[in-house]
Curated annotation (Swiss-Prot):
Name of the protein in question: Protein S-acyltransferase 24
Organism: Arabidopsis thaliana (Mouse-ear cress)
Record-stated family: Belongs to the DHHC palmitoyltransferase family.
GO biological process: cell tip growth; regulation of cellulose biosynthetic process; regulation of secondary cell wall biogenesis
Gene that specifies this protein: PAT24
GO cellular component annotations of the record: cytoplasmic vesicle membrane; endosome; Golgi apparatus; Golgi membrane; trans-Golgi network
Region feature Disordered, mapped onto this chain: 1-29, 576-620
PROSITE patterns xref list: ANK_REP_REGION, ANK_REPEAT, DHHC
Domain remark from Swiss-Prot or TrEMBL: The DHHC domain is required for palmitoyltransferase activity.
Tissue: Expressed in root, leaf, inflorescence stem, pollen and floral tissue.
Extracellular side: 298-307, 437-461
Topology in membrane: Multi-pass membrane protein
């Protein structure tokens, strides 16, 4: 049995093709002179004339059952909405589907109108006939800023289920709005909530094939989230495979395998696994130093050390030992963990909110929702990142190094770089000393073949030391050069790897731009003296970014074309056909190809979720 969310979009047809006359519905001329159109367009002067001179009512719905206040809310007409309220408009008036003006304001994220409505007494928890609150609608359309506003300032419930048991997180996961998912998880939305079909948000993201949504949910979740089955007995990975979303199926299956193999940190084996490869590297360096000392520096079958060679030999030993000390500090030091903001349920009061969000936080004002960490429950700095291995957010995250069993970040990158630098210098010196000592053996034969045989039989330790050092030197040297280059440009390994994803690394025109690069000399001096590079705020605005503001170019109303919730189709782009979404009720079904999905968000509020039990199972 197949599991599916269906969104059927109807394209507005041409009246000529259907043989319809221009007289169908309400005349266009009359539309231009009613309070509803004036409210939608924000024509306050015309609205004033219609209400105060012609006696038009603002408290009555139009022929389709919608209020003027709803139209003004949809298009963020604040002045018009204020006028309508002052002249009898009811902020809690509902249309035939139970929707209020607040529902309509959530469609396009009209925060200003929503704030006005709520200040005038609008119910933030008002539900329509489908159980949708404003938070559901905002999640359906990816209006993250709207969600943040009504939850943080007006205590809207970010995890309330609708009539089908689906929370805003279900909707955001299905629609693939990763930023909304981050915010909802940040607000402690329940990842494991199952709707009437037994589906969690991860199930719906998998069905739709939204890889980014699945990634955010998995990173913030646990192994159990991947193992939950719906009423058909399928996990998210199996549903993704059924829908032929192979990349999502592979990701979910691989994530489950990794989490299942991860040992419990409280067990002896788990504590041992947390040590990583640091003990291996530590033992390797100690063994190399031991072999170097016994088989090269103090070797009895080699000539006595001269003053110059002896000084170099012990300098290499000292550098390697100092590198070991820095290696220990790097592996044990706090790399820049950011304090987690997780409440203790036992000490929380019943009326205390799970999390308090600062509305004036620069990250939220700028719309940088990727700075929200759903695991640590913090708004992390711009250059910080959550490490999946350490399960903590790290300031100026560079990378997680398994060889030091720790992250490399703002507070330990100095030790990490100097450790690499000292070890490279030590390998150069000790390798050169070893080669010089072996070549100076007076008992060695002159022919190359005989000399090799002599070295292999009489200087096994020195030869082994040279071979191991040769293998290690190039990889460590390359890593050191890369780190030095990044330090000189004040950029991290993580930023280099994700330069195309991070908006703060893009300048005008989308080209790469590092706002933190103060020049090679300043970058290097800051790092060597302070131990880290400074973060410089980037005050330049990207003109190419789409604003959160609401605008409406043109509007057309067709009384015969409605969506399932009763919203009239609105054409905001006259060069494209308008669309409306059809709500699937329990009594209707439509065939739908899950492989072809529209990335456009329907303009109506009706985005009903439905399962089609009659569809055959699609094999991957």
């Amino acid at each position: 049995m197949s599991s599916e969310i269906e969104v059927v979009e109807e394209i507005q047809s041409n009246p000529k093709e259907n043989g319809e006359s221009s007289s169908k519905g309400i005349e266009e001329e009359s539309l231009k002179n009613d309070v509803y159109t004036a409210a939608a367009y924000g024509d306050l002067e015309k609205l004033h004339r219609l209400v105060e001179c012609e006696g038009s009512s603002v408290s009555e719905p139009d022929a389709l059952g919608y209020y003027a206040l709803q139209w003004s809310a949809l298009n963020n007409r604040v002045a018009v909405a204020q006028y309508l309220i002052e002249h009898g408009g009811d902020v809690n008036a509902t249309d035939h589907t139970g929707q209020t003006a607040l529902h309509w304001s959530a469609v396009r994220g009209a925060i200003q109108v929503a704030e006005l409505l709520l200040q005038e007494g609008a119910r933030v928890d008002a539900t329509d006939m489908y159980g949708y609150q404003a938070t559901h609608v905002a999640a359906q359309y990816g209006q993250t800023a709207f969600l943040c506003h009504v939850v943080s300032k007006w205590n809207a419930d970010p995890d309330v289920p609708d009539n089908d048991g689906r929370s805003p997180l279900h909707w955001a996961a299905y629609k693939g709005f990763a930023d909304s998912i981050r915010l909802l998880l940040f607000l402690d939305a329940y990842r494991g909530r199952q709707d009437k079909e037994g589906c969690t948000p991860l199930h719906w993201a998998a069905i739709r094939g939204n890889l980014e949504a699945c990634t955010v949910l998995v990173q913030a979740g646990k192994k159990e989230d991947l193992m939950i089955t719906d009423k058909t007995g399928l996990t998210p990975a199996q549903l993704a495979a059924e829908k032929n979303h192979r990349q999502v199926s592979f990701f979910l299956g691989n994530a489950r395998s990794l989490l299942e193999k991860r040992c419990d940190g409280s067990s002896p084996l788990g504590r041992l696994s947390k040590l990583g490869l640091a003990p291996v590297l530590w033992i390797m360096i100690l063994l190399l130093l031991l072999v170097y000392t016994n088989s090269v520096v103090l070797a009895s079958n080699l000539p006595k050390l001269t003053t110059g060679i002896g000084a170099l030999a012990w300098l290499g030993f000292i550098l390697a030992t100092a590198g070991l000390f820095l290696f220990y500090r790097c592996s044990r030091k706090d790399p820049g963990y950011i304090r987690m903001n997780i409440h203790d349920p036992q000490t929380m009061k019943d009326d205390e909110p799970l999390l308090k969000i600062e509305l004036n936080n620069p990250a939220l004002l700028a719309g940088n929702w990727t700075q929200l960490c759903a695991t640590c429950k913090i708004i992390r700095p711009l250059r910080a990142k959550h490490c999946s291995t350490c399960d903590r957010c790290v300031e100026q995250f560079d990378h997680h190094c398994p060889w030091v069993s720790n992250c490399v970040g703002k507070k330990n990158k100095w030790e990490f770089f100097l450790f690499l630098l000292l070890e490279v210098l030590a390998m150069l010196i000790t390798g050169g000393v070893t080669l010089a000592r072996v070549l100076s053996d007076p008992s060695a034969p002159s022919s190359f073949g005989a000399w090799m045989s002599h070295v292999a039989s009489n200087h096994v330790g020195a030869l082994s030391f040279l071979l191991v050092e040769f293998c290690l030197f190039f990889s460590v040297a390359v890593l050191t050069v890369i780190q030095a280059s990044q330090i000189s440009r004040n950029i991290t390994t993580n930023e280099m790897a994700n330069a195309l994803r991070y908006s703060y690394l893009r300048g005008p025109g989308g080209r790469f731009r590092n706002p933190y690069d103060l020049g090679c000399r300043r970058n290097c001096s800051d790092f060597l003296v302070k131990g880290y590079n400074e973060d410089i705020e980037c005050h330049e605005e990207d003109a190419t970014q789409r604003p959160e503001g609401i605008s409406m170019m043109q509007m057309q109303r067709n009384p015969n074309l409605q969506n399932g919730n009763g919203h009239v189709a609105i054409d905001v782009n006259p060069t494209h056909n308008s669309q409306s979404a059809h709500v699937h009720s329990a009594n209707c079904s439509h065939s739908h190809n899950s492989k072809s999905k529209s990335d456009n968000v329907p303009l109506g509020l009706g985005l009903g979720l439905s399962r089609n039990p009659t569809r055959p199972v699609v094999s991957p």
